[in-house]
Each structure stands twice: as C-alpha cells, then as structure tokens.
C-alpha cells in the first residue's frame, strides 16, 4: 500500500517527478490547476506537453481565470497541436464582479495515463519553488477512479458553476476513500462540516497545517472543546504568509485558541 503513495514537500522534487512521469506518458495527460504561470516552470511544462501532443498523447488542461488569466495566448501552441484548454469561470465585471468572481477552482490535480495522479497544494509556477508545500503522488486504483471522475466533472462543467449544481457538491466514494467535491458557497461548505465532525470526535490528537488559518465560530468552538477533552491540538502555520491581510486578522483567533490551550 505505501508504495502507491509518495509525499512531496519540496516543489523542485515534485516538478521533477511530474515532468518525468509526463515524459513517460503513453496515452493522456490531464491537468486541473489554479495557477499555470507563464514563467520558466510554466514554459518547461508547456514545452513537454507540446512534445507529447506531437507523439499523439491526449492533453486536457483546465486552468482558473483568476489564477492563470483568461488569455489563452500562452497555450496557443498546445491548442494548435490538439490540446483541449479550458478556462474556469472567466472574470465577470459590472454588477457581477463581487457576486460571482469569488467562485474559483483552486484545485491542483494532474492525472497521467489514468494510472498516476498528483494532488496537493502546488501550482505550476517557479514563484513557489522555495515554498513549503504538501503534495502526494498516487498509484492507487480506487483513488484514481475518484480523481478521474472529479476531473471529468470539472472539465465538463467549467462554465456552468452554480450554487445548485448537485454534481459539484457530491461526495465520491470508492473503497475506504471519500473525496469531497467542494466549492465556494456563501452558505455552507461541506468540507468545513466534515472537519468539524472529525474534530468533535477526536480522542487523542489533532494536527492542522495550513498557510491561512481563519477558523469560523464553529471550528473554533470544536477546537476549544477538543482541548478541554484532553486532545493534543497543534496548529502549524507560517509566521508570514503571502497574504498580509490574513496574517493580521488571524492574530485575533490565535489569541482565543492559545488561551484555550
């Protein structure tokens, strides 16, 4: 089982592994990514994808309009060779600017030949090479089936986002795996509910590692209650994230949680 999973916390090693697997691909490369930067690393991936297209490999690419931009010029060489490139939720202006532009696709998923997948926190970017990230290389058939289905859902409905889109909300199950398809919601996010339930049932230890820690009322309540039950509770975060505003706001929550233990 363990040989089916490999964890990366170094982006350079991650990208080297991704590029190596893409180079060996025989059938398809699917990429769903928030930010595909037009920098040295982005060009390296684009160049390799172009080579694979010329070999007859299927390439599908879904990028987010906020993270990557809505202009497809950078991807034109791929499109000309037959790649399917889609932009998730192009930016809306006017009255819809604040109402809809927060609905982003922040996923980072790469699937190669339907046999290998990468999922985690890293974008395709040279900018984040020195960041501490967490990504997993997967060769588990059950989990790959879930990830393929999730990618197909996103790729098919890239311009039809809706709060009422049931397909975007469902949990995908396979064996012991549960994959929660979540998305920005002004009412409630299923992943938050899942976290709260897991924390409320914790008996010995809770470890949270995140760059942005802004827990809502319910999550703060469950964390404090866990400490009171004797659960060893640890939150790991950077002293300074790349979003200064978040660093300022989180001080309030850290004070409350620190006092609780």
Regions found by a protein language model. Give the residues of each.
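Charged, low-complexity intrinsically disordered terminal segments
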Residues: 1-87, 92-261
């Amino acid at each position: 089982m363990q040989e089916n999973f490999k964890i990366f916390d170094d982006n350079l090693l991650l990208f080297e592994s991704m590029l190596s697997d893409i180079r060996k691909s025989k059938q398809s490369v699917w990429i769903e990514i928030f930010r595909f930067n037009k920098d040295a690393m982005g060009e390296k991936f684009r160049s390799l994808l172009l080579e694979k297209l010329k070999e007859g490999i299927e390439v599908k690419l879904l990028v987010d309009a906020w993270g990557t931009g809505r202009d497809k010029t950078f991807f034109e060489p791929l499109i000309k060779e037959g790649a399917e490139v889609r932009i998730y939720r192009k930016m809306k202006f006017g009255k819809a600017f604040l109402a809809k532009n927060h609905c982003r696709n922040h996923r980072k998923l790469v699937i190669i030949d339907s046999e290998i997948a990468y999922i985690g926190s890293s974008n395709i970017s040279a900018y984040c090479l020195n960041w501490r990230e967490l990504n997993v290389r997967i060769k588990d058939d059950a989990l790959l089936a879930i990830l393929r289905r999730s990618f197909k859902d996103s790729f098919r409905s890239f311009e039809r986002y809706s709060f009422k889109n049931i397909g975007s909300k469902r949990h995908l199950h396979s064996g012991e795996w549960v994959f929660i398809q979540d998305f920005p919601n002004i009412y409630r996010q299923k992943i938050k509910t899942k976290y709260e339930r897991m924390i409320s049932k914790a008996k010995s230890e809770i470890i949270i590692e995140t760059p942005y820690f802004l827990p809502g009322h319910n999550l703060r309540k469950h964390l404090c209650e866990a400490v009171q039950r004797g659960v060893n509770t640890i939150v790991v975060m950077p002293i300074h994230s790349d979003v200064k505003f978040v660093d300022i706001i989180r001080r309030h929550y850290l004070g409350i949680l620190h006092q609780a233990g």
